[in-house]
Curated annotation (Swiss-Prot):
GO molecular function: 4 iron, 4 sulfur cluster binding; ATP binding; metal ion binding; nitrogenase activity
Binding-site positions, [4Fe-4S] cluster: 99, 133
Keywords, alphabetical: 4Fe-4S, ADP-ribosylation, ATP-binding, Iron, Iron-sulfur, Metal-binding, Nitrogen fixation, Nucleotide-binding, Oxidoreductase
Entry EC number(s): 1.18.6.1
UniProt-listed CDD domains: NifH
Family designation: Belongs to the NifH/BchL/ChlL family.
UniProt enzyme class: oxidoreductase
Organism: Zymomonas mobilis subsp. mobilis (strain ATCC 31821 / ZM4 / CP4)
Protein name: Nitrogenase iron protein
PROSITE patterns found in the cross-reference section: NIFH_FRXC_1, NIFH_FRXC_2, NIFH_FRXC_3
Modified residues (ADP-ribosylarginine): 102
Gene3D superfamilies listed in its UniProt record: P-loop containing nucleotide triphosphate hydrolases (3.40.50.300)
Amino acid sequence: MSKIRQIAFYGKGGIGKSTTSQNTLAALVELGQKILIVGCDPKADSTRLILNSKAQDTVLSLAAEAGSVEDLELEDVLKLGYKDIKCVESGGPEPGVGCAGRGVITSINFLEENGAYDDVDYVSYDVLGDVVCGGFAMPIRENKAQEIYIVMSGEMMALYAANNIAKGILKYAGTGGVRLGGLICNERQTDREYELAEALAKRLNSKLIHFVPRNNIVQHAELRKQTVLQYAPDSDQANEYRELARKIHENSGKGTIPTPITMEELEEMLLEFGIMKTEEQELAELAAKESAVAK
């Protein structure tokens, strides 16, 4: 049996990470790949479109009902979705109580011990990326995920999160085999977005794997709890996800050790691309507005 490809999608909350990952994985199945998704986001929305349902019951919530995780069976937590993709959500605690990363650690250990990784070509971790704390870094830190794909956009906070995630990868790249597979830009139609995404990828010693164009068909599919590949398989957007899946499939062993940049360098980059303004520019604009009002 060939080695399992263990990949992870990281990205800041609200960037479209779970939507992008599920559409990409649905396209990977078309390439004949067997897939297990492990959702590592407390929102537990990493498998919704694959299962065509509301959020899946999580390992932590089921363990709480059963008494402990040892009282669970694999079939309690693992559901089969679109084209037999295996789906698991690790879950998290109530807001303000405990560490959400604990669910990730508990889930991965349980799944490995109970044979969930048997007979799959890919394991995909869908991970919250605003905070690269110990728990959320678990797939990286414990040498589970080998290829990290960062979902980002041309917005400042998405770029900031992408750079932070690169720092997390760098921290563990020396002790394990984890590498940055590349950046995936989810178009938000900001100024010079494609150029900026390519420039950041280059600065991080990586590449822009794919630029996913914005298309309302994604929202139409989501409202029906489906991936675009299921909802509109012949659409241009479905083909974008197929192209992204093909690029990831052909990217095995091509990941890099990232070179994250400082906050100052990131701000300089944003100034260079006209996304941020200098203090002088902002003062000049303010003076012009005040002058216009005075007239």
